[in-house]
Amino acid sequence: MNGNDFLDKMELIDLAYVEAADKVPKKKRAAWLKWGAVAACLCVAAAIVVAVVPQRGEPQPSESIHLGTTAPSESERESDAPTEPKTEKPSERETEATTERNSDTVSLEKITIPDLYAGFGFEGFAVYDISEYRRGNPWSPDMDLTTLPVYRNGAYDPSRAGVPRGFTEEEMKEQLERYADAFGLTILSTETKWENVYVKLHDPRTERKAVWVEAQTDGGVLRAVASGSASYTPTRERARLPEGYRFTYSSTTDEEAMKTLAYLTELYADVLGLVQPVAVTCGDYDYYGKFDRIYFIYDGAGTAEEVILNYNFCRVGFASDEYGDAKDDSEKSEAGSLRYLSQSNTLLLAEKLGDYPIISAEEAKELLLSGCGQSSVPPDYPAPTAETVEHVELIYRIGALEEVLLPYYRFDVRLPDKSNCGAELGLKSYGVYYVPAIAAEYITNMPTYTGWFNS
């Protein structure tokens, strides 16, 4: 959702997005705000055995109990034969793209690009150098991808309150049973959380639905959310990490973080059905230069497309109990322990609309520079230029406010230094811009960036 920290009704936020917000309040942050758990972060990513880049200044997806694919389309059922990889040169692709799209994908419906909601502030981040900025995204411009799937989001909230939707109360209870079996837990009791009165007032015709179901077990608390995510909060005994592990948000080094992720992966990846887990540790800085780290894993098994879907839609996040009952930084734990883990899978409720032809990152950059795209960066900042666009990656935007789930090129654009954004510490600020990755002929409303919450 946009942004994940802006809802004060914390009980209505999908657990897949609250990790960063579920901490003791910190010092005032810079003008940028995180969109999601990984939307604004300086990341270090690797498979468990791969070394990470040192942090500055430091002394569809796979089958599982939760990560599953959506139902295949009729055409996919008729033929399981893999598509032959295309080998034409980039120049050939440019000259033949329109003909190929028209002949192979005439049945695809046109897509309306969802509006971009940013809540308070705008989406951006700060790093010391863009070369440090790694989020663990498996996509690269060298991948031979000509199409990517587009989905209708079954967890979309038309009230735009950001309320998790999708599964019924009974379906969530069934999920809890599967998780309890996987973790070897016995469910003792369950409690259902219902939508608050705001949703009913917004549209009196709307039937009040269950938001989540929580189960007390003999080994902790399980929670299934209507949007498809789930979490497990272990008992204090189960949550404690062995000696020698460090699991904090700001005082853990990259090496320590990867060691902790390796331990947690060994403990939970197989239970959750990850075949080839890839660990990512990332974070961003406030304007005092304080680093704020998060931890997650995703399944790196499968084709390039499947891994991209796993990365964007199907993650397991780990939250630290670094603060415990502490009121501020001075009282927090030095080593930390596991507060909870959360597993997301937006595709559980998604309806596949088809495999849509995509444009290249270079084509998307040209569109961005011509004024096409979406951003929550305020209008008093200069428009992107070829010189200020410093990083690009392909992502899917997720959350209850995204009616359609489609690939975008995300551009990180250097913003002018401002005194309240850590520039005096050497931090550089970046704003985030999006350009739809699907071909323009399949878009009904190619967005144009005119500044300030455009659509």
Annotate each predicted stretch with a short phrase.
Residues 1-29:
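Disordered, charged N-terminal biogenesis/targeting segments of membrane/secreted proteins
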Residues 34, 84-89:
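Intrinsically disordered, low-complexity polyampholyte segments enriched for Lys and acidic residues
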Residues 17, 183, 187, 372-375:
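Short, flexible helical or helix-coil boundary motifs
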Residues 10, 34-61:
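Single-pass transmembrane signal-anchor helices and their membrane-water interface zones
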Residues 400-408, 414-455:
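C-terminal soluble interaction/assembly domains
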Residues 61, 65-72, 78, 90-317, ...:
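Preferential activation on post-signal-peptide N-terminal prodomains/segments
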Residues 258-409, 413-421:
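Segments that shape or occlude catalytic/ligand-binding pockets
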